[in-house]
């Protein structure tokens, strides 16, 4: 109500009282213009303003839920490891970025899902965040100022010592005896039809590479419709993702000229001294992984040096109270943080759980155990935690070392953690028995709580949210068919055949997700509810971004069973890629796999060259090209040799 309408009631000087005031007010003449009346009016206005100010302050205190976090942030501003993450939108989507850029296997939750479930999750997350923030604030306030200062100084000293050691490490790499790689002779298949199909896949690689070279050379990825470069925020200012990711595919396919071009660019231009924030996971699997495999295949020293240099740059990500690394790292300052959307600032299982293979090889090639120690610390933390129903939630807080939201997935956010448990055991020449036990214990829990069979007989892997199942399976989850089959070798004899059959069932389900689309390429996610089976029902799940996981499973199933249907299914994918994804400027993902009219996303992902085309090429090659008895593929399809000569050393470290 306007203040002016009230003043005549209190400012009549003539003792006319309330009635007089009303009369004056209605008559339109404002009485009470004398000094005494002015003082009363002024006091009343000031009283109202003061009341409004008090109300505003109280409301701010009451309605700002993050005030305790603000306090915590101010007190800890000198300690990056304890500083809560700033509000930030992580690119386009989610494995944020994953939903649109297609590669952060663990980041699918950045995209909106079911509104009801999302609201409930958000409320639970808000309550959890508030409780955690209050606890942190209380703990902080209980500390004496000198204790806080001591903690800050200790952390600074630790960082300085680590940086000094890292510089010493990079100054002089020890000499290593390069062993000629096993199984890289690129012999032609005896069968003429298979030989012709393999040649076609090599031509696809040539088309993808030449257009990247023509329109986006030195940049991270290609926009094949626009015919220009494309860079995801996942890589910060680091350049050349496609060059590094494609190195081993070029080598394996015998594209020697292109391999030398890539090597020359890396030697001259690949620079990690950038002031930018990167995804530790993505940089590790693509850049570290690509450089390591290029070294092991070619013996070129530049690749070893660059891999170790980058590994050193990533070490500050581990400067957390628990040793669980941050998801994001500024390459210059060494300051890390987590994705803002990740369950109260948690680290993500598939991200911190997908460092083991690369970091073990970094220690092997550098002679410094620090890399192996970092990933073994992650395992120590995980083994001390209780697992709900034997399952590993997707979120773990790096400060408290405790689980975040209880969401379990073998697809986005969780997938490659399980893959790396199995492959850590295999890569150690089957001496890492701890990794083997963790893998089979996890698989048993997955079978009990997540694996289901539809009414139509399709086996699928659901997601687990606080004890409730969401009957959805992502394209990313389709890698698990190959994982189960590969793990059959280490299972008890009575279970080995079971795991081969389970892998075959997952392969069939994922093939059905392809076969039930118009373009014969699978959607980002597909569901088993409401009478629907292996079909995407939501528009934001109908896209295909040149992903490799289904073809990855075909490759393992072919190598382990030699059932000809896997080559048939792989060739169906080749024909679909050529019909619907190939354009003049390269290969593009699709926005909707259920419609006839192509709607391109205009991105040629680097993993299309690193994974999709490599797995297709291996399916139509003989088994002695990169034989599984000698090579382990990281989650970006970069082959690493099994560390046979390091058997005793690794066994001793991991006990």
UniProtKB/Swiss-Prot annotation:
Topology feature Cytoplasmic, residues: 1-43
Biological process per Gene Ontology, one example term: ERAD pathway
Catalytic activity: N(4)-(alpha-D-Man-(1->2)-alpha-D-Man-(1->2)-alpha-D-Man-(1->3)-[alpha-D-Man-(1->2)-alpha-D-Man-(1->3)-[alpha-D-Man-(1->2)-alpha-D-Man-(1->6)]-alpha-D-Man-(1->6)]-beta-D-Man-(1->4)-beta-D-GlcNAc-(1->4)-beta-D-GlcNAc)-L-asparaginyl-[protein] (N-glucan mannose isomer 9A1,2,3B1,2,3) + 4 H2O = N(4)-(alpha-D-Man-(1->3)-[alpha-D-Man-(1->3)-[alpha-D-Man-(1->6)]-alpha-D-Man-(1->6)]-beta-D-Man-(1->4)-beta-D-GlcNAc-(1->4)-beta-D-GlcNAc)-L-asparaginyl-[protein] (N-glucan mannose isomer 5A1,2) + 4 beta-D-mannose; N(4)-(alpha-D-Man-(1->2)-alpha-D-Man-(1->2)-alpha-D-Man-(1->3)-[alpha-D-Man-(1->3)-[alpha-D-Man-(1->2)-alpha-D-Man-(1->6)]-alpha-D-Man-(1->6)]-beta-D-Man-(1->4)-beta-D-GlcNAc-(1->4)-beta-D-GlcNAc)-L-asparaginyl-[protein] (N-glucan mannose isomer 8A1,2,3B1,3) + 3 H2O = N(4)-(alpha-D-Man-(1->3)-[alpha-D-Man-(1->3)-[alpha-D-Man-(1->6)]-alpha-D-Man-(1->6)]-beta-D-Man-(1->4)-beta-D-GlcNAc-(1->4)-beta-D-GlcNAc)-L-asparaginyl-[protein] (N-glucan mannose isomer 5A1,2) + 3 beta-D-mannose
An annotated Gene Ontology molecular function: calcium ion binding
Domain of life: Eukaryota
Cofactor(s) essential for the protein: Ca(2+)
Membrane topology reported for the UniProt record: Single-pass type II membrane protein
Post-translational modification: N-linked glycan at Asn-515 consists of Man(6)-GlcNAc(2).
An example Gene Ontology CC term for this record: endoplasmic reticulum-Golgi intermediate compartment
UniProt note on regulation of activity: Inhibited by both 1-deoxymannojirimycin and kifunensine.
Membrane topology (Lumenal): 65-655
Cellular localization per UniProt: Golgi apparatus membrane
Disulphide bridges: 478-510
Biological role stated in the UniProt entry: Involved in the maturation of Asn-linked oligosaccharides. Progressively trim alpha-1,2-linked mannose residues from Man(9)GlcNAc(2) to produce Man(5)GlcNAc(2).
Glycoprotein is among the record's keywords: yes
Protein name: Mannosyl-oligosaccharide 1,2-alpha-mannosidase IA
Keywords carried by this UniProt record: Calcium, Disulfide bond, Glycoprotein, Glycosidase, Golgi apparatus, Hydrolase, Membrane, Metal-binding, Signal-anchor, Transmembrane, Transmembrane helix
Active-site residues, as the UniProt record annotates them: 524
Protein's UniProt keywords contain Glycoprotein: yes
TM segment ranges: 44-64
Its EC number(s): 3.2.1.113
UniProt-annotated glycosylation sites, renumbered to this chain: 515
Pfam name, any one: Glyco_hydro_47
The protein's annotated pathway: Protein modification; protein glycosylation
Enzyme class at the top of the EC tree: hydrolase
Family in the record: Belongs to the glycosyl hydrolase 47 family.
